[in-house]
Amino acid sequence: MEGTDPVNKKLAAALSGGAVLVLALSGCSDDSNDKLNSWAKQVCDKVQPQAKKIESANAAIQKETSDNSAPADVQKTDSKAFQDMSDAYKAIGDAVDKAGAPNVDGGEKKQQDAVKELDKISTSYADLKKQVDKLDTDDQAKFAEGLKGIAGSLDKLSQSGSDALKNLEEGDVGKAMAKQESCKSASATPSGS
């Protein structure tokens, strides 16, 4: 199984890069804007379970790849993980959509851009699931080659998602989100620091 091992590691690394963007909803500040705070709470409460789902999907892929598993097992795990991620990003997009525009300058554009990006990421993960499902698990070299292509797509995907949310979380929106307990616990760093 040595043939696919470096590729699997690359895949796992690309994936964890993608998950970081959802888990990056933390920072610190304390200005008061009730409307914005209630918007942030609404989004954060919805994001938290999805962030956990993405984290679990990542963990599953990393476990499968570090165990030097057979191609068929890697395929099965990756396929489920990509489906979970697709669902999670769709749900986060829906949450941002339903929350309406945050009460800041240009809030509507920020919101719409983020929703558009999140939906696009959801679709991209669904496409990766289809790609991984089609890989030939009987031919190890071909399987490794296919995974390499998927890892490349993931790199791009994590970057675009990161940009979408970075934009939404700029300024007061990010500060309001940082104060929400659910966003703190969804973040990759332990709260209480």
Protein language model features and the residues they cover:
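Immediate post-signal-peptide N-terminus of mature secreted/exported proteins
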Residues: D30-D84, S185-G192
